[in-house]
Curated annotation (Swiss-Prot):
Propeptide residue intervals: 20-30
Protein name in UniProt: Delta-actitoxin-Amc2a
Pfam families: Defensin_4
Gene3D superfamilies xrefs: Anthopleurin-A (2.20.20.10)
Length: 80
């Protein structure tokens, strides 16, 4: 009987470990910039971030230009 209980405990631990692993999915943060902007020479709009030294990570931005005062315009716009 002890072997059966031990086996059930092992199965329960393994199932909970795999279930917890599936819940974690790497995604970009939901919060985005509220303002739109356009860099010189670009036709499409980007996201304007205030008080940032550059574009935030994990948002998929691949181009940026700096604007006045203390703002950065990041491309491409995700989700639009």
């Amino acid at each position: 009987m002890n072997k059966v209980l031990f086996l059930c405990l092992v199965v329960l631990c393994a199932t909970s470990a795999f279930a917890a692993e599936e819940e974690y999915v790497e995604r970009a943060p939901v919060k985005r910039a509220l303002l739109s902007c356009r860099c010189e020479g670009k036709t499409e709009y980007g996201d304007k971030w205030l008080f940032h030294g550059g574009c935030p990570n994990n948002y998929g931005y691949n181009y940026k230009c700096f604007m006045k005062p203390g703002a950065v315009c990041c491309y491409p716009q995700n989700g639009r």
